[in-house]
Each structure stands twice: as C-alpha cells, then as structure tokens.
Amino acid sequence: MRSGDLFQLYIKESHILRERVSSLVKAGWQIVNFISSNISDSASLEAEVIRATDCPWPLPDEDAWWTLDVVEEIDQWKDLSQGLFVYVSDFDGLIRSSPAEADTLYQHIARMQDRYRWERLRDGDEDLKFIYGFECSEKNLPLVREFFRGHVVVVDRFDPEHPELESAEALGPFAEEYPHLPG
C-alpha cells in the first residue's frame, strides 16, 4: 500500500453503497463490482476479474497476474467518459477466507487507480473520474482497518445529486483521525 492512501469503506448494513451505485449508474458511470464470495484461489480471482470487468477476452492458461493487464485496458471495451466506480462486495469475507487473494485483488484495484486516476491526471486528462471502495460489515470493521493498516475512512453519506464527489465531510467517523484532508 502506498503511504497517503485512504481507503473508502462502505458499511454493508448502511445501504449507502447501494444508493451511491444507483446514483452513479443514473449519471452514466461504469461500475465494476468484484464479488468476494466468487473468489477462493488464483483461478477464481482470474474468473472474477473477467466477470466484473465484462472483459471480452478469453481466459488464457496463465496465473492471476495477467489480469493486472486486463484492469488497465477496461477503456478499450467500456465507455469511461462519465466515470468509473470500482468496489469490492463483502471484502471482510475475502480477508477472512483468503487473505492472499484479498491482497492480490487490492493490487488490481491499485493498478486501476494508477491507470485511471494518476496516469490520466499526469497526461492532462482531468475529466476522467475514478472512485473505488470496499464493502464490509460493521462487526468486521476492525479486521478491514487492520488490513489497510488503519488508513481507512467510512463513508457515512453522499449527495445523490453529486454522487461522484468525495470530500472530508463525506467521510465517516474516522475523518477526525485524518486532519490533513481538505474540509
């Protein structure tokens, strides 16, 4: 994990994630949802990356690391002009059942962030919006905080009229732990 990253967590019981996804879909965003219960090993992680990204390419006979290339190429078959929202359902379940695959899936999302946020900004394309988050149950919040070494914020609300906006005000009860965030 890169220092300075803050990972957005959505508490499963709050339904905020479902409402945000619905608002983003209405605004024309592309949604990639990795479903943790579909992942148990490298082969199932590969299949889940293909499923979640709607990748039109067939699965090659290689290990999971080739899918890092797939997540960088989504813009070849999806229209990302309005934005891209990536989230992992039941991430706490994946951490508990397969911590190595949870780490590998996180690396895929980090690669997507590099490609669709940082590279685009560096190249002067400030219009592409990229947001990602992880869903977990409230009871397993400590487990997920530990996985991300405490660098988390809980999304406790969003503006349905502007679901793409991220700010310190939109961050949950741990926001006071990150005073360096803009207000």
Task: Please provide the spans of the model-predicted regions.
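N-terminal intrinsically disordered, low-complexity segments enriched in P/E/S/T
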Residues: 1-59, 75-183
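A short, well-ordered alpha-helical element
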Residues: 64-76
